[in-house]
Each structure stands twice: as structure tokens, then as C-alpha cells.
A protein has these predicted regions:
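Cofactor-binding beta-sheet edge motifs in enzyme active sites
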Residues: 1-285
């Protein structure tokens, strides 16, 4: 089975995630399913991955297409079995009907249709529109230690609890949260673009900008508390932006807990040291 979806995978694991439900629905093993993501040579419609909508929107389309495929083969096999269409059942592994000894799997049904030249059973398409709403929820907890003498801020523990609705693949969801949180933490602590007085760019590489560093990102504790969403068939919410969106706010609140009322990101040692000095001087007056 080839599955074409109109969204490009850039490391999010669409080829694994989007194939999961069709495999379960059709009874085909994973090695029988091949994913094509936003391939304009095969599908005229497609775009990149942006926003947390790939699962909540796009995953419903392959599911609907497989439902149509099952319905089409049910009709085809009813004729082969010599029974009424409404008595043919597909139990996730085989088609069957009372009074018939014919019990083909989905793959066997496909081979039967091909042998009879039924090309109309080779392609099944479906659209998935935007859900009425997507309501992911969660909490990010940042625990930091600030060295007042140097202004150094160290992230010692980071905990995330998220509700993304039903999860297709827990490992993929946790990976996105992990990577997003690492990006958000580094954005909060170091990421910036600096120009000199003449407008020349000083942060000309990722060493200065900067990319997340493993030494600065703690082990991130992730817990999921899924509540199925009623607005789409699969009960899923988006998850792609959760880690990156929650981290800056959590760290900023942790910094404020030190008595710092206002400081612009990134929270570099020099900025934190200057603000702590001002706080100390104000307290002495």
C-alpha cells in the first residue's frame, strides 16, 4: 500500500506516524506500507510542515481513505462471495460473510481485484479539513540555580506534563517535546543576533547565535495525560510546538522568582549580573 500525504516530513517521523493507523485498519504489516510525503510528482497538493497540525489534521485523511478502501473491497468481495454487501465484515485481518468459505486478507483481496483488472480499486482518496478546535494543554516547570557573583544561570531540572489527546506514537511525541524544550531553553539563555555600532553582524555562526548545547540542557522529564479530543475522529491534538513555546515562559518565571522583575531574553550572564546588581543596590537604598 502506498500512502500519499500532503505534508513534508522534516524529521517529525511522519513516515512512521501516518502509517500507523492505516496499518492497524487494513491488517497490513508495516513493511507493506510505503509513505510519500508532499511528493508533487505523485500528488498535486502539498505543503511543508508548520504548526502542530500534521497529526490532528493530516492523520485523519489516511484513516478516511482506508475506510473508503475497505468499503470498496467489501462491495467487490460481496460479488465474489455471492452474498449481500451488508453482511460482509472486515475484522481488521480478514473479510468474511456468513455462508461463504472465502476469507481473504486485505492483501489477498487486492490481488484478486488486480487479477480481474479492477483498476478502480487501486486508488482511494480522502480529505481531512481543519478541526473546529485543537486544545492541547500542558505545564512546564523550570528549576534553575543562579550564581549571583557571575550571573550564570544553570538549568538543573526541567519537567513537562502535556495533554495532546490520543497519541499515535508516544516515542515520537516525546521526541518532539524534548527537542522543542531544548530549543526553547537555549533561546531563553543564549540565542540572539548582535550588530555592532556600524550595523555589522557579529553573531555570524551558530557558535554565537547559538544552537542548543547538550551540556546546558538537563534530562527533561516528560509525562503525558491524554484526554481524547472530540473534534476529530482520532481524538488527537497538536504537539509540535509545545516544547519550544513552554520553555521560555517557564524559565522567565523561574528567573523572576529570584527577585528579578524585568530582564530581556536571552538571560546571558552579563545581563543577569547587571540586573542582580541593580536589585541589590536598590535594596540597600
Amino acid at each position: 500500500m502506498n500512502i500519499d500525504v500532503g505534508r513534508q516530513s522534516n524529521g517529525q517521523g511522519h513516515e512512521t506516524v501516518h502509517a500507523g493507523f492505516p496499518a492497524d485498519q487494513s491488517g497490513l504489516s508495516a513493511d507493506r506500507i510505503q509513505m510519500f510525503c508532499s511528493d508533487r510528482g505523485r500528488n498535486a497538493q502539498g505543503d511543508d510542515t508548520s504548526g502542530p497540525g500534521s497529526a490532528a489534521i493530516r492523520a485523519n485523511a489516511p484513516r478516511a481513505a482506508v475506510d473508503r478502501m475497505i468499503a470498496a473491497f467489501t462491495s467487490f468481495l460481496a460479488q465474489e462471495m455471492g452474498v449481500a454487501e451488508d453482511v460482509v465484515e472486515f475484522d481488521g485481518e480478514t473479510f468474511w460473510a456468513p455462508g461463504s468459505n472465502l476469507t481473504p486478507t486485505m492483501l489477498e483481496a487486492m490481488e484478486m481485484a488486480r487479477a480481474q483488472g479492477r483498476t478502480d480499486l487501486q486508488r482511494h482518496a480522502a480529505r481531512a479539513g481543519l478541526p473546529d478546535s485543537s486544545l492541547p494543554d500542558g505545564a512546564n516547570i523550570s528549576e534553575i540555580v543562579i550564581d549571583p557573583e557571575a550571573g550564570q544561570t544553570d538549568q538543573v531540572r526541567y519537567t513537562v506534563v502535556d495533554d495532546f489527546g490520543n497519541l499515535i506514537n508516544l516515542m515520537s511525541a516525546e521526541g518532539q517535546v524534548n527537542g522543542g524544550a531544548a530549543q526553547g531553553l537555549e533561546q531563553t539563555m543564549l540565542e540572539r543576533v548582535v550588530f555592532d555600532a556600524e550595523g555589522r553582524l557579529l553573531t555570524v555562526s551558530f557558535l554565537g547565535c547559538a544552537l542548543p548545547r547538550a551540556s546546558r540542557v538537563p534530562m527533561i522529564g516528560i509525562t503525558t495525560e491524554p484526554v481524547p479530543l472530540a473534534q476529530n475522529q482520532l481524538g488527537m491534538n497538536g504537539s509540535g510546538e509545545a516544547g519550544a513555546a513552554g520553555a521560555p515562559v517557564a524559565v522567565a518565571n523561574a528567573v523572576q522568582d529570584r527577585g528579578i522583575r524585568q530582564v530581556d531574553m536571552p538571560f546571558t550572564p552579563s545581563r543577569i549580573w547587571e540586573v542582580l546588581r541593580d536589585v541589590s543596590e536598590a535594596a540597600e537604598q
